[in-house]
């Protein structure tokens, strides 16, 4: 898509003259006026030019009448302060495009020949309380002012107790392979798609409630979600976004005293828990299972219609009239999925339930259940206690990604000619090489390496092996490699600052000095200034803080007592994972995990 560069030059401001409240600038391509808030930074010396570069896509210009600050961020003055002013578009794209379940009664059943069922959320019986929200999602994606969170209509909306004009709540029908076997119809058993919102940047977001009541796809469930799993979904998706991972987003966390009974560890001991609702967003909630159920049921016309829709709206780089568009679609998903999983591996993230019904066709991370981040580096780490065989362990994620791609190929096969079907295994075979290339690209960055050399794979593999042997912390080892100077690393990490606890663990390995020598030689002749740049590169990609299970558990336990301070504080800290934050350090978030962290168990129960 074309991009336009708008350069505003020759705005002369004298510091001796009082700045006007707003500088008006005319957008040269669309003849619309936008405004820039004046600050002292905008008061330049005499004859000094102020140059501002603004980029906008062809149909995504700056919003007329909106106010922007010097960082090109839209002022809060232009946001909606009431949900009565905010609304979904009059055209509900999904509702108007696809056949909808003709049965309006809300009862569990097998559904045929549709993509969605129309069904309303079930209001909470007890008072809904908004306990946390993401301001970046609220203002940046949904154009809402923070003050709206203090209003009853907003809380009722995000709780599923009411819905707004233009909303047609839908539950999506899909299937999926769960733990390797076909499970038939699954679908949104406790989620309601409220509508599609197009924000002022031209971005399209689908808003979905999770934990909002029964649907035709609830199977044996009650349609609700408990507080502990909802806290994890809310914090997990936002933490992943700030780590630079493609992911769904979370707007809000609502809690109620509605009693929910769950057998958390499937041991025959159910207990009562609080209900919670998360409002989450994604450009699309279609997943591999969305296509699988149509292919399995031989609903080929509907399958073709759905894939064409997804290509048209989410893969615009593909010619929607091309006879080979389905192969191009599959190839793009192969590429993006390989990168997504390489990104997971690079931050020590294990999803926990990589079923095809939890795997986005847009290759974004969705459905945060029993996920976890590595503490000590253990390739066999299994975050999900329900995963008895370790199918979804950290080290097997790339392999499972390939399995899921093959299931996607099976779902697309009915749309292809015989010669095209023969291309599927060839495209699939490229997944491994793409993943390996992306993996090495990311780990080179984690080590501050520039360019690519043959010994890089050995340097990375040797480091990971030493980390496994010494049970070194995955996140903090990489972070501290970016803290210590190369000169100090070459001498002896054990002589380094005592705060470098992860490197102290690593340095106990008998091969550490040999690895440090190879790593230093790979960096070539680094002078002090170049070494500082290496460390800066590393600190920009290696987080200081991640959502460790023990941190999430502490927030959940506080929330269970009605104290949501830890949830809010964690969100604030996780928004800046690459920065040093004294308040986080005071809580021990960059320290060695406590011993009791090893005993935390997370299951599929939610």
Short names for language-model regions:
Residues 106-113, 205-216, 307, 311, ...:
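Active-site-adjacent bridging/hinge elements
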Residues 229-230, 260-263, 267-351, 362-465:
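ATP-dependent phospho-/nucleotidyl transfer catalytic cores
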Residues 2-173, 179, 388-606:
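Regulatory N- and C-terminal appendages and interdomain linkers associated
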Residues 127-131, 135-319, 361-366, 374, ...:
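Conserved ATP-binding subdomain of kinase catalytic cores across diverse folds
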Residues 121-123, 222-224, 327-328:
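Short, contiguous strand/loop micro-motifs
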Residues 354-359:
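Hydrophobic residue at the +6 position relative to the catalytic HRD Asp in the kinase catalytic loop
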């Amino acid at each position: 898509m074309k991009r336009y560069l708008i350069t505003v030059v020759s705005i002369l401001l004298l510091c001796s003259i009082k700045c006007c409240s707003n500088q008006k600038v005319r957008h040269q391509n669309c003849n619309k006026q936008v405004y820039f808030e004046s600050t002292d930074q905008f008061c330049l010396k005499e004859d000094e030019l102020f140059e501002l570069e603004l980029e906008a896509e062809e149909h995504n210009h700056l919003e007329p009448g909106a106010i922007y600050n010097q960082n090109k961020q839209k002022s809060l003055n232009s946001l909606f302060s009431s949900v009565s002013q905010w609304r979904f578009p009059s055209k509900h794209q999904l509702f108007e495009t696809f056949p909808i379940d003709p049965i309006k009664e809300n009862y569990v059943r097998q559904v045929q020949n549709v993509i969605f069922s129309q069904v309303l959320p079930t209001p909470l019986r007890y008072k809904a309380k908004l306990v946390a929200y993401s301001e970046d999602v609220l203002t940046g994606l949904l154009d809402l002012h923070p003050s709206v969170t203090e209003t009853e209509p907003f809380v009722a909306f995000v709780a599923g107790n009411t819905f707004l004009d233009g909303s047609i709540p839908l539950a999506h029908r899909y299937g999926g392979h769960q733990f390797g076997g076909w499970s038939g119809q699954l679908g949104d058993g406790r989620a309601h798609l409220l509508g599609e919102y197009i924000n002022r940047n031209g971005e399209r977001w689908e808003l979905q409630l999770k934990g909002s009541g029964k649907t035709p796809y609830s199977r044996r469930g009650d349609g609700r979600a408990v507080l502990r799993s909802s806290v994890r979904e809310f914090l997990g998706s936002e933490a992943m976004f700030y780590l630079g991972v493609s992911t769904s987003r979370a707007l809000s966390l609502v809690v109620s005293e509605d009693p929910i009974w769950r057998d958390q560890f499937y041991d025959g001991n159910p207990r009562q828990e609080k209900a919670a609702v998360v409002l989450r967003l994604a450009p699309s909630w279609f997943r591999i299972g969305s296509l699988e159920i149509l292919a399995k049921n031989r609903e080929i016309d509907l399958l073709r219609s759905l894939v064409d829709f997804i290509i048209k709206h989410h893969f615009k780089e593909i010619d929607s009239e091309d006879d080979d568009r389905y192969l191009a679609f599959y190839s793009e998903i192969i590429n993006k999925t390989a990168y997504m999983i390489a990104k997971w591996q690079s931050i020590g993230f294990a999803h926990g339930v990589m079923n095809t019904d939890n795997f986005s066709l847009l290759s974004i991370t969705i459905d945060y259940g029993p996920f976890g981040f590595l503490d000590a580096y253990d390739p066999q780490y299994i975050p999900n206690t329900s995963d008895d065989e370790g199918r979804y362990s950290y080290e097997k994620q790339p392999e499972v990604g390939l399995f899921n791609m093959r299931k996607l190929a099976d779902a697309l096969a009915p749309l292809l000619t015989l010669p095209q079907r023969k291309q599927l295994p060839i495209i699939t075979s490229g997944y491994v090489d793409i993943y390996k290339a992306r993996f090495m690209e990311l780990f080179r960055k984690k080590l501050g390496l520039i360019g690519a050399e043959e010994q890089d794979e050995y340097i990375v593999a040797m480091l990971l092996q030493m980390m496994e042997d010494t049970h070194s912390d995955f996140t903090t080892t990489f972070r501290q490699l970016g803290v210590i100077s190369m000169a100090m690393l070459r001498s002896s990490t054990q002589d380094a600052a005592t705060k470098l606890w992860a490197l102290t663990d690593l340095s106990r390995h008998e091969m550490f000095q040999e690895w440090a020598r190879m790593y230093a030689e790979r960096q070539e002749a680094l002078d002090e200034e170049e070494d500082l740049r290496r460390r800066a590169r590393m600190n920009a990609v290696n987080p200081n803080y991640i959502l460790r299970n023990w941190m999430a558990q502490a927030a959940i336990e506080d929330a269970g007592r009605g104290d949501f301070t830890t949830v809010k504080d964690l969100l604030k800290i996780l928004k800046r994972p690459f920065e040093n934050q004294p308040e986080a350090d005071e809580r021990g978030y960059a320290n060695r995990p406590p011993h009791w962290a090893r005993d935390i168990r997370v299951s599929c129960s939610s």
